Amino acid sequence: MAEVAQNSPAEVQAKQVVYCGVCTLPPEYCEFGGTAKKCEEWLKDNHADLYQRLYSEEALSSNLSELSVSVRERAAKDAAKKEAKAAAAEARDAERKAAAKVQIKRVERNKRKHVTVITGLEVHGLENKKVAKELGKKFATGSSVTKSPAGVEEITVQGDVSEDVQEWLLELYGKEIPESNIELVEDKKKKASG
């Protein structure tokens, strides 16, 4: 019995897998995504040895020799379609980001109390919860993510900090949000007649 315990197997090592920096798949599967050319360039720059194994002339010719002519043509057409689709989606996304406005609204709560409401950050790739937490820390005030009646998520910050928030957003997220896309709005409550 004592001999069995001493002959325990060596510790199993986890396999190291390289993931593509463009599509986040292993490089062997990049060809099935829409960004095959970009993935290939990334692999060439970052992992030359793996690039040689997957995309060298010998590897490509051995893979193509196994396919029939009609299958090769179909594969080329499919790859071209996927690439065109990915390029169109990327262009639409860039256009949508360029047109999207981040609205910083100062809303009067009662008499001299105000809240600042920020909408449109998620379009620029920012997470509302993280930004709300950072705002709360930065301005030492309460901030939360709420759903507006329109169903859009918005960040509500207690206090009149709209101009400070604009400066802070440009300072921290200037790359994601251009200054021309940030809009300051003053929203006053209507007085009840009676």
Swiss-Prot record:
Domain SUI1: residue ranges: 102-173
SUPFAM superfamilies, per database record: eIF1-like
A single Gene Ontology CC term: cytoplasm
One GO BP annotation of this record: formation of translation preinitiation complex
Gene3D superfamilies assigned to the protein according to its UniProt record, in alphabetical order: SUI1-like domain
Alphabetized Pfam families for the sequence: DENR_N, SUI1
Major localisation: cytoplasm
GO molecular function: mRNA binding; translation initiation factor activity
Keywords recorded for this protein, A-Z: Cytoplasm, Ribonucleoprotein, Ribosomal protein
Cellular localization per UniProt: Cytoplasm
Assembly information from the UniProt record: Interacts with the 40S ribosomal subunit.
UniProt domain comment: The SUI1 domain may be involved in RNA binding.
Family the entry assigns: Belongs to the DENR family.
Protein name, per record: Translation machinery-associated protein 22
Organism field: Neosartorya fischeri (strain ATCC 1020 / DSM 3700 / CBS 544.65 / FGSC A1164 / JCM 1740 / NRRL 181 / WB 181)
Lineage: Eukaryota, Fungi, Dikarya, Ascomycota, Pezizomycotina
